[in-house]
Curated annotation (Swiss-Prot):
Keywords: Coiled coil, Transposable element. The keyword Coiled coil applies. Retrotransposons are mobile genetic entities that are able to replicate via an RNA intermediate and a reverse transcription step. In contrast to retroviruses, retrotransposons are non-infectious, lack an envelope and remain intracellular. Ty4 retrotransposons belong to the copia elements (pseudoviridae). Residues 39-115 form a coiled coil. This is Transposon Ty4-J Gag polyprotein. Residues 378-414 are annotated as: Disordered. Capsid protein (CA) is the structural component of the virus-like particle (VLP), forming the shell that encapsulates the retrotransposons dimeric RNA genome. Residues 404-414 have a biased composition (Polar residues). GO terms for biological process: viral translational frameshifting. Residues 393-403 have a biased composition (Basic and acidic residues).
Length: 414
């Protein structure tokens, strides 16, 4: 049976099998009659016939060699007989290897033809998409019923969308279109990836033209749109409004969302200044640690030191998971000990006592002397120590009182 050309199904990207798709499949026989398809079929058939002719020729040679081997006279000289048998045996082995090679080539052509027929049938009935990748010689299958389950209508959640999309394509063994080395992929694979990522973009989030059919343009456009929004937000923030996380944070999902945005923004910035940053892991870890209050930071560092990093997990994902687990383990048990949000900045990531915007504080929460002023989260409040200037002033007042008392006693004696 003739092999269908790629154009028969490469534009079919709808999960539901519509009448248009069915009609496209029904016209396969017509498509095969094009000069291009007929030429491909002719070349393949000629190749098979050539293999068959060579196979028959080698089989004839093999039969002749075996017959010659049987006719060798036992009356000949033993040494001559051994030499003839050895030479004949080597020739027979070469012919047999050549026959095996030809049989495998013929079977491969037949298998590819059957796969193309199966591809045409199953893809048209909506079971899966079949595509080629740059990183594998085998064909890959993406089940049509596996839908990209992340949706967003908010531009602020684009980093999460891209992160989930990257995990999704890794799961189904697509080419990693986030790698700088990959600049072009199979057209069919490109169409499938465009369809998948558009499933995650809500109707109100019309960042890219819905008719765009280049996955690289879509990803680049999403990154640029997101970085512009994030840069504007960061420029409008005051220093005291940066993210601060302590052990009272209970909203793990929101915290993970925030840390993922931070990591993805850092990665995007570094990708613009250098293609392959050797210290990227250290920079990402420093960025995450910079958001943690000292009551949490040391515990996270200890866990990162003690727990080995699973090579199957990205380093940034390992960092974020470690922070989340540490927050959960160190958070106070009683809910009544935790505020719903900070009374100064309304953040849900830290309590009021640690807020950088808290007024009239003598010490900042990231100061090395903070432990002298307040206990860690969940402990009782401690009275702040008086400064040296205050202690000196109190001492002077006490000295004056003593002098006045002595003077009064002397006056009374007189």
């Amino acid at each position: 049976m003739a092999t269908p050309v790629r154009g028969e199904t490469r534009n079919v990207i709808d999960d539901n099998i519509s009448a248009r798709i069915q009609s496209k499949v029904k016209t396969n026989d017509t498509v095969r009659q094009t000069p291009s398809s007929l030429r491909k079929v002719s070349i393949k058939d000629e190749q098979v016939r050539q293999y068959q002719r060579n196979l028959n020729r080698f089989k004839t040679i093999l039969n002749g060699l075996k017959a010659e081997e049987e006719k060798l006279s036992e009356a000949d000289d033993i040494q001559m007989l051994a030499e003839k048998l050895l030479k004949l045996g080597e020739t027979i082995d070469k012919v047999e290897n050549r026959i095996v090679d030809l049989v495998e080539k013929i079977q491969l052509l037949e298998t590819n033809e059957n796969n193309n027929i199966l591809h045409e049938h199953i893809d048209a009935t909506g079971t899966y998409y079949l595509f080629d990748t740059l990183t594998s010689t085998n064909k890959r299958f993406y089940p049509k019923d596996c839908v990209f389950d992340y949706r967003t209508n908010n531009v602020e959640n684009i980093p999460i969308l891209l992160n989930n999309f990257k995990k999704f394509i890794k799961k189904y063994q697509f080419d990693d279109v986030f790698e700088n080395d990959i600049i072009e992929i199979d057209p069919r694979e490109n169409e499938i990836l465009c369809k998948i990522i558009k499933e995650g973009l809500g109707e109100s989030l019309d960042i890219m033209n819905t008719n765009t059919t280049d996955i690289f343009r879509i990803i680049d456009g999403l990154k640029k749109q997101n970085i512009e929004v994030c840069m504007v937000e960061m420029s409008e923030l005051e220093p005291g409004e940066k993210v601060l996380v302590d052990t009272t944070c209970r909203n793990s999902a929101l915290l993970m969302n925030k840390l993922q945005k931070l990591v993805l923004m850092e990665k995007w910035i570094f990708s613009k200044c250098c293609q392959d940053c050797p210290n990227l892991k250290d920079y990402l870890q420093e960025a995450i640690m910079g958001t943690l209050h000292e009551s949490l930071r040391n515990s996270v560092k200890q866990r990162l030191y003690n727990i080995p990093h699973d090579v199957g997990i990205d380093h940034e994902e390992f960092l974020i998971n470690t922070v989340i687990e540490t927050v959960i383990d160190l958070s106070p048990i009683a809910d009544d000990q935790i505020e719903n949000s900070c009374m100064y900045c309304k953040s849900v990531f830290h309590c009021s006592i640690n807020c950088k915007k808290k007024p009239n504080r003598e010490l900042r929460p990231d100061s090395t002397n903070f432990s002298k002023t307040y206990y860690l989260q969940g402990a009782q409040r401690q009275q702040p120590l008086k400064s040296s200037a205050k202690r000196t002033k109190v001492l002077e007042q006490d000295t004056k009182k003593v002098e006045q008392s002595v003077q009064q006693q002397k006056t009374g004696n007189y």
